[in-house]
């Protein structure tokens, strides 16, 4: 029963990731209709791209963690909850960014818009760093458990070695 609930939660988490990605794309497309100062702001583009990086950490690494025998189903559920929380926060940042790209927000000055963009950029950068840290710590837990069993090569084969992107 517990594994069925965990599997259900994981599917919901993945669906949430897809939803957030689609929101980000919609907001980015809406930038085409906004003042040149904001539309050309590199930070807006980077903020949206960072969501893709966060989603990539989740999708690529959590899929590997699901096949890792060093994690229990309860631990995988907790890890999925951690990623979900980060993705929800990233979705909130995109909602804040929506204020900038929303044409009906005519009362905002360019400075107000740039302040919102800057705040969103900083928060998304923090969330991206948090996601990398969270992923690396979970992989290191698996590695330490594998080390106790003299099975580190399997973990390296699964996640890659230290020279690779995620850890």
Identify what each model region corresponds to.
Residues 17, 21, 48-51, 124, ...:
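Long amphipathic alpha-helices with heptad-repeat character
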Residues 34, 39, 43-47, 63, ...:
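Extracellular, luminal, or virion-exposed ectodomains of exported proteins
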Residues 5, 39-42, 46, 74, ...:
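Primarily heptad-repeat coiled-coil rod domains in cytosolic scaffolding/tethering proteins
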Residues 138-167:
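A cross-kingdom marker for long, charged
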Residues 1-40:
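Start-of-domain marker
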Residues 8-20, 45-52, 73-75:
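Short, mixed-charge, low-aromatic patches
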Residues 51-123, 127-133:
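Extended amphipathic alpha-helical interaction segments
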């Amino acid at each position: 029963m517990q594994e069925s609930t965990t599997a259900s939660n994981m599917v919901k988490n993945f669906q949430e990731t897809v939803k957030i990605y689609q929101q980000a794309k919609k907001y980015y497309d809406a930038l085409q209709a906004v003042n040149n100062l904001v539309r050309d702001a590199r930070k807006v583009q980077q903020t949206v791209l960072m969501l893709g990086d966060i989603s990539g950490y989740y999708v690529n690494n959590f899929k590997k963690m699901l096949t890792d025998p060093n994690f229990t189903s309860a631990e995988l559920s907790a890890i999925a909850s951690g990623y979900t929380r980060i993705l929800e926060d990233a979705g909130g940042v995109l909602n804040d960014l929506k204020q900038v790209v929303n044409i009906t927000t005519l009362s905002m000055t360019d400075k107000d818009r740039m302040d919102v963009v800057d705040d969103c950029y900083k928060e998304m950068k923090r969330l991206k760093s948090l996601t990398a840290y969270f992923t690396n710590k979970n992989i290191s837990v698996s590695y330490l458990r594998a080390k106790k069993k003299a099975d580190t090569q399997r973990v390296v084969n699964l996640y890659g070695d230290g020279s690779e992107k995620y850890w």
